[in-house]
Amino acid sequence: MRWLEFASRVDGEAVEAVSEAFSRVASGGVVVEPDVVTGADDGFTVGAQATVRAYVPVDDRAPEKQSALEQALWHLRTIWPVGELSVREVDEQDWANVWKKHYATFRVGHRLVIRPSWLEYSPSPNDVVVTLDPGAAFGTGLHPTTRRCLELLEVVVRPGDEVLDVGTGSGILALAARGLGAARVVATDVDLLAVDAARENVAFNQVDRQITVLHGSVDSAPAGDSYDVVVANIIARVIIELAPRLVARVRPRGVLVVGGIIADPADAVANELGRLGVVLQRYVDGDWITFLGYLDGTN
């Protein structure tokens, strides 16, 4: 089989909208590849632009999908800086590996290092290395809110904590939590492809006994269990919908981290969580919002 690769260069604030447009035509998922800049002092930073990429099979529907995507990008271009759609064919044997060249090892926070599994890395003594093979459908922590969630986990996860990761994707946050000292992590995702990818990454990092990956959402975690840290890096609408159940899973004086939120609905998320007794700190990364929430033990 041959595949069409669709790609567009966009500014950071347009990533979510463009990714949504791509996902409507590419059922296999979307790759978001922010620019990675390597510093002279072993630092890795993310640039202001990203490439959104997806693959669809070359079949009778491919021209229709291309036309629909071009039209969607034309409309989005009236709001944000969005590049033209580039299209190229790749062979089956190339498709499995073509996206790998767009990834690099990079550092997040003070200790976390995210390493694609096919790249070598020599860790420093204090590094917490998370090794990922995300597959073409899943990111590796370069999205602004994923990075912020990783940075917050580095601050709030304590040795021996139990952590719930809702919407785990590649498993990056669950793996980071374990690497930072969590004794047990439960990770869930409604997408079976994500569940498979996360389980493979958990196995690759040899933490099968500490991390359990389940198909589903917050209710898929064992009934009655609560956690020191609950993290959900998804989208605002789903966070609002799940808010009561997410908060119910946080232990008294525990921590809730929610991300994947664009600026416009952020106040609605804050209002819903505040109504449930969560005291919030807001972190802004461009047009993306992440909340760190604390329970005071009264819930």
Model regions and ranges:
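Active-site capping/gating segments
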Residues: I261-N299
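A short glycine-rich, Lys/Arg-flanked "PGG" loop and its adjoining helix->strand segment in the class I
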Residues: A243-V255
